[in-house]
């Protein structure tokens, strides 16, 4: 094997030592390769691998690095000619599993467990990894603490009156949610510092102590104003010299009078004499802004100043930059009057937060369960307070290696300082890819070292890896052209010069000369909407954008590109559902890396939550009626109305059910035999469930409901059935997690879910088994570290998220708390009101300072997010956005005034831009970027839409699924249906027939028609759980149904073309089954299938095989004479020539081959249904039907069914 040729910089990064080293590794520069090779070189030099501390950002990255090291160490040993060196490499391989390679969280846990006695905790602590449990504990602590303060507990440090003022400053509408949000925000921020209590005590009020008036604000507050003033006067002077005023002489004296104030204004700003500045500026502002068209000066200045004047001065309704500054001054002069009161609120907030932090930590100690941040703080305390432990570790580790250093937090930085001996840090990262500010990572840590290490006198070393070995030149050049004009120190936190620019390193793979076919392509959907509607949407994406991308993706796939080589990157996962639905409509396989959204709002979960509420309290009418109306019991509007009129309007619906059952209501004659039987069946089941509430855990109750009512099977047959089933399983997992946390009782669980929904929170759903060759959909953040041949960036026009800049508190590490203060301006002379209060929410000085810092940091991070997204593409980048259709020139004239200031896009466009699309189009206008532009409309989309015929539409479940998703609308219908419908149905049998049936139900119904008195009722099939990652439900007994279900899932994903023990075992391991279930799947026996002729046929026709094919079919019941839908999923079929080979797996247990004929008879009707569906779908007459019997002794039996 030829040796990889290293660049000089890579070679330096691998071999340099004896000092702290910072490797600035651009995207695609091979940083993981460099780190792995450096470790191998250290081992060769005699450093044992367990003497290296290697920190990665994620567990996945740690796992991948271990695998890479195993491969590289083996390769190095094989190539080594030195026996001693080979021995070292062998020893490293042996110790690799024990090496300190992992996240900082994993290391701090290990350190804390080993030294638990130094921080007074139990060594058997557990991590509060489940958000639900930590939310529960935190909520309880918060509520108890608030209650204590409101009860006037004298032992506490805030009086009741002052505490009530504190709450009112952040909350409204008589609740404390606003205050609670503020407390949680501050707690989270403090937890990311190296010593939360110290920060809260010493830094939290620093801003209030520093910024008490306008004159305390930094030079940054006035520097832009000076620039804007100079620009303003320059415009006026140009107008006097070359403009309309010079030519016509109109208003020359008045203009000169304005210019006379120039020096006084500039001097007032320099001295921070804001009173003088305000008076002088407002006089100028009035001269320019006020007047009529007869005012010669005004008319002349309007012509000369045009848009630039508006930007600087503006009007009251739309103030310019200078007028905004004046407004800030006025605001500042007002807030100065209330600074003392605001400081008192801030001080009380500090006291409460400290008390909350300590109480919450004490509660976690009692539970012996901690958050990751707690463990990190314990670890820091252990190292700071115990020099012996600290020095032992420093002596033990020869080098401290940190991957993704740009995403390090201050807590992690403190850990590194404590572990390092001062000259053995090896840090790898890329400041341009620091995108985790929302997790409180601080890119400033990287930047500070980057600048200091670059100084000649600094003993430490900076190494730059600029070559990109991932992408084509077209992608790299476009990326460079964007960011060299976008980033600088002021905004972006760095200048994107030659040293930062990407350099193509894969010249042998991709040509240096640009090819226009690979130019990045900007797809703009021209939509019939206003600009406000477009820009006000932070993350909303239109169908047109997705369809435009889908058509391009379809073209790529048809040209031979594998779906797995294509990625769609989005700002937020909130659009995942829509993207998946549209891509599937184009027959494009798709994977949602972060799943579908709104788990708690999915209809199948909403129905189950109503059922739990009704079980907990049947007197809750809405949930009880929802339960009756749901597919589990199927009461229709007529039946519910008949029940409703059994009592007065104010009588509970549950009481009306009891009256109906006893025939003692107001209108007993309306409870016909059919409804009576239906009510009895419901009451029997409902009563049983209510009794079980105190006998079995909630998650087992849920599964009992799922299986007994066939509800799990039912939702699985609907559109997106696998995801619906995953949602139901997720609800069960959450219930189990809740109970394992020490909480018991259905009432508390329902209350918890209700609170989540009230606060618009969601819970994570369970992942389902995903197709391997599919287009990936993920957020920009999720894509970091990945690469794809073709990348689509969606929703470019969406606005940047500026919600954090509008919150009641904004925090900074240096200045602490910035908060808004609610003042009563009733006594102010300019305020006239008849109300007893004139409450106004104002920004305090620390808030203004923190807001400005946060805004710049947020825009800088947005630039880096865009950089990360661009650099995921190997071959081609697609940018997808949206514009309004009312614009001329395709809606792009907005950017005509975009200009460069030097090499950088003007501050006006960088600061005022609302999204990525603004930046890109502004630069396109100013610099002519190397990209294609394609503007398309809805009509063009429809015209160009492709027709796909690769597979018949088995999923004709849309109408029924929509009916299911809108099932809750029945409540309005009930209100309208108050008239008594006193009649018998002409088709009474139809009331007993479900409108939707599975093949199992059809089979059962077929049996029922043949039963004679005294015969045994047929047993229903087990419910199949398709495509699920099974969760651990404790030490319960594994049922035959679970084993059968898992076996079906395995058969679906097993690659029949590689039917061997190794391949099948690997597939089984990847599927994530519970270990107990996995051990019950007999792969050796399954492999005997491929010793048969039928098995060989399957392995030879994998490309013609369709597995897990859903279908729907309309049938007519012979007794009810009514139509109903049959839905199901057949395990698979093979289409060859003019016939179809249908097969279905059966896991029924049998020990004697004589039982096979009985099994064949049992499933004959079901297989005939599948056959009928395939005949209709493919218009094929010949369907050969086979049962693959997996439950027999020693081997798999294949049986053909007769027609």
Curated annotation (Swiss-Prot):
Keywords: ATP-binding, DNA damage, DNA repair, DNA-binding, Exonuclease, Helicase, Hydrolase, Isomerase, Nuclease, Nucleotide-binding. GO terms for biological process: double-strand break repair via homologous recombination. Its cofactor is Mg(2+). GO terms for molecular function: 3'-5' DNA helicase activity; 3'-5' exonuclease activity; ATP binding; ATP hydrolysis activity; double-stranded DNA binding. It catalyses: Couples ATP hydrolysis with the unwinding of duplex DNA by translocating in the 3'-5' direction; ATP + H2O = ADP + phosphate + H(+). Residues 4-472 form the UvrD-like helicase ATP-binding domain. Residues 503-785 form the UvrD-like helicase C-terminal domain. One of its GO terms (cellular component) is DNA helicase complex. SUPFAM superfamilies: P-loop containing nucleoside triphosphate hydrolases, Restriction endonuclease-like. Pfam families: UvrD-helicase, UvrD_C. PROSITE patterns: UVRD_HELICASE_ATP_BIND, UVRD_HELICASE_CTER. NCBIfam families: addA_Gpos (TIGR02785). The heterodimer acts as both an ATP-dependent DNA helicase and an ATP-dependent, dual-direction single-stranded exonuclease. Recognizes the chi site generating a DNA molecule suitable for the initiation of homologous recombination. The AddA nuclease domain is required for chi fragment generation; this subunit has the helicase and 3' -> 5' nuclease activities. Heterodimer of AddA and AddB/RexB. This is ATP-dependent helicase/nuclease subunit A. It comes from Lactococcus lactis subsp. cremoris (strain SK11).
């Amino acid at each position: 094997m030829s040796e990889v040729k290293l660049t000089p910089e890579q070679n330096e990064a691998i071999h340099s030592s004896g000092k702290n080293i910072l490797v600035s590794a651009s995207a695609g520069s091979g940083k993981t390769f460099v780190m792995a090779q450096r470790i191998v070189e250290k081992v060769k030099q005699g450093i044992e691998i367990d003497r290296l501390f290697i920190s990665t950002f994620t567990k996945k990255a740690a796992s991948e690095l271990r695998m890479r090291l195993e491969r590289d160490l083996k390769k190095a040993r094989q190539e080594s000619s030195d026996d001693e060196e080979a021995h070292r490499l062998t020893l490293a391989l042996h110790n690799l599993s024990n090496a300190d390679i992992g996240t900082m969280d994993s290391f701090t846990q290990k350190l804390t467990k080993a030294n638990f006695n130094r921080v007074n905790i139990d060594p058997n602590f557990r991590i509060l990894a489940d958000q639900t449990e930590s939310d529960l504990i935190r909520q309880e602590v918060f509520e108890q603490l608030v209650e204590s303060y409101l009860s006037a507990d004298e032992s506490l440090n805030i009086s009741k009156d002052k505490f009530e003022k504190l709450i009112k400053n952040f909350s409204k509408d008589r609740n404390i949610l606003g205050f609670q949000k503020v407390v949680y925000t501050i707690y989270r921020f403090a937890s990311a510092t190296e010593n939360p209590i110290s920060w809260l005590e010493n830094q939290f009020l620093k801003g209030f102590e520093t910024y008490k008036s306008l004159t305390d604000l930094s030079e940054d507050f006035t520097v832009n104003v000076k620039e804007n003033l100079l620009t303003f006067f320059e415009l006026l002077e140009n107008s006097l010299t070359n403009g309309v005023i010079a030519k016509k002489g109109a208003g020359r004296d008045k203009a000169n009078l304005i210019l006379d104030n120039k020096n006084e204004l500039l001097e007032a700003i320099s001295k921070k004499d804001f009173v003088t500045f305000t008076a002088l500026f407002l006089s100028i502002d009035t001269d320019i802004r006020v007047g009529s068209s007869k005012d010669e000066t005004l008319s002349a200045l309007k012509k000369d100043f045009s848009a630039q004047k508006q930007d600087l001065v503006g009007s009251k309704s739309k103030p310019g930059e200078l007028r905004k500054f004046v407004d800030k001054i006025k605001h500042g002069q007002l807030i100065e009057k209330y600074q003392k009161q605001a400081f008192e609120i801030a001080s009380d907030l500090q006291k409460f937060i400290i008390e909350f932090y300590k109480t919450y930590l004490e509660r976690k100690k009692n539970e012996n369960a901690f958050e990751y941040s707690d463990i990190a703080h314990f670890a820091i305390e252990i190292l700071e307070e115990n020099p012996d432990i600290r020095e032992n570790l420093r002596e033990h580790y020869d080098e401290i290696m940190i991957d993704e250093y740009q995403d390090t937090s201050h807590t992690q930085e403190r850990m590194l300082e404590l572990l390092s001996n001062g000259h053995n840090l090896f840090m790898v990262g890329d400041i341009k890819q620091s995108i985790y500010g929302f997790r409180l990572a601080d890119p400033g840590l990287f930047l500070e070292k980057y600048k200091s290490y670059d100084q000649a006198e600094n003993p430490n070393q900076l190494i730059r890896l600029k070559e990109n070995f991932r992408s084509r030149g077209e992608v790299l050049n476009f990326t460079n052209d964007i960011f060299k004009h976008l980033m600088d120190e002021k905004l972006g936190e760095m200048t994107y010069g030659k040293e930062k620019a990407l350099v193509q390193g894969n010249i042998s793979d991709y040509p240096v000369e640009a090819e226009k076919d690979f130019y990045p392509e900007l797809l703009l959907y021209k939509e019939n909407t206003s600009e406000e509607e477009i820009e006000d949407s932070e993350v909303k994406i239109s169908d047109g954008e997705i369809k435009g991308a889908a058509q391009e993706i379809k073209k790529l796939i048809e040209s031979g590109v594998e779906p797995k080589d294509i990625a769609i990157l989005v700002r937020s996962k909130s659009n995942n559902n829509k993207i998946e639905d549209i891509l599937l409509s184009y027959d494009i396989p798709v994977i949602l890396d972060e799943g579908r959204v709104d788990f708690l709002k999915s209809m199948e979960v909403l129905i189950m939550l109503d059922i739990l509420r009704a079980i907990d309290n049947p007197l809750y009418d809405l949930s009880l009626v929802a339960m009756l109306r749901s597919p589990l019991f199927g009461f229709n509007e007529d039946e519910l109305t008949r029940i409703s009129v059994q009592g007065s309007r104010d009588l509970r619906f549950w009481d009306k059910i009891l009256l109906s059952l006893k025939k003692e209501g107001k209108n007993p004659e309306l409870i016909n035999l059919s409804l009576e039987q239906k009510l009895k069946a419901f009451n029997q089941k409902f009563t049983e469930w209510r009794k079980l509430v105190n006998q079995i855990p909630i998650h087992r109750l849920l599964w009992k409901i799922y299986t007994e009512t066939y509800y799990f099977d039912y939702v699985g047959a609907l559109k997106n059935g696998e995801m619906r089933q995953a949602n139901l399983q997720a609800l069960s997992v959450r219930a189990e997690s809740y109970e394992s946390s020490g909480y018991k009782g259905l009432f508390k669980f329902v209350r918890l879910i209700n609170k989540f929904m009230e606060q618009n929170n969601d819970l994570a759903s369970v992942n389902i088994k995903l197709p391997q060759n599919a287009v990936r959909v993920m957020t920009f953040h999720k894509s970091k570290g990945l690469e794809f041949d073709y990348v689509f960036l969606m929703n470019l026009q969406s606005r940047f998220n500026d919600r954090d800049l509008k919150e009641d508190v904004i925090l900074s590490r240096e200045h602490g708390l910035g908060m808004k203060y609610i003042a009563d301006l009733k006594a102010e002379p300019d305020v006239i009101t008849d109300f007893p209060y004139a409450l106004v929410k104002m920004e305090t000085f620390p808030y203004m300072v923190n807001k400005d810092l946060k805004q710049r940091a947020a825009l800088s991070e947005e630039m880096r997010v865009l950089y990360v997204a661009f650099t995921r593409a190997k071959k081609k980048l697609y940018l997808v956005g949206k514009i309004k259709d009312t614009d001329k020139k395709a809606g792009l004239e907005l950017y005509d005034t975009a200009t460069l200031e030097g090499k950088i896009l003007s501050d006006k466009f960088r600061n005022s831009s609302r999204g990525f699309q603004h930046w890109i189009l502004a630069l396109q206008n100013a610099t002519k970027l190397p990209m294609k532009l394609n503007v398309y409309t809805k009509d063009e989309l429809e015209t160009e839409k492709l027709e796909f015929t690769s597979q018949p539409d088995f999923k004709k479940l849309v109408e029924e699924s929509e009916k299911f998703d809108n099932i809750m609308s029945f409540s309005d219908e009930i209100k309208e249906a108050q008239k008594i419908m006193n009649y018998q149905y002409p088709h009474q049998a139809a009331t007993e027939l479900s409108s939707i049936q599975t093949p199992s139900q059809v089979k059962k119904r077929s049996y029922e028609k043949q039963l004679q008195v005294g015969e045994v009722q047929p047993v229903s099939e087990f419910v199949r759980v398709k495509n699920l990652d099974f969760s651990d439900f404790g030490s319960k007994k594994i049922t035959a149904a679970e084993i059968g279900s898992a076996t079906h899932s395995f058969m679906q994903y097993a690659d029949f073309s590689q039917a061997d023990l190794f391949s099948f075992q690997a597939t089984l391991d990847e599927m994530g089954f519970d270990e107990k279930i996995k051990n019950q799947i007999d792969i050796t026996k399954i492999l005997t299938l491929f010793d048969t002729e039928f098995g060989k046929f399957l392995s030879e026709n994998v490309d013609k095989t369709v597995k897990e094919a859903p279908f729907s079919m309309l049938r007519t019941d012979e007794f009810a004479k009514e139509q109903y839908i049959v839905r199901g999923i057949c395990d698979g079929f093979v289409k060859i020539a003019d016939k179809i080979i249908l097969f279905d797996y059966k896991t029924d247990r049998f020990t004697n081959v004589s039982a096979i004929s009985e099994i064949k008879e049992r499933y004959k009707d079901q297989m005939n249904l599948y056959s009928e569906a395939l005949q209709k779908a493919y218009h094929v007459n010949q369907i050969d039907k086979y049962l693959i019997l997996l439950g027999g002794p020693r081997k798999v039996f294949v049986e053909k069914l007769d027609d």
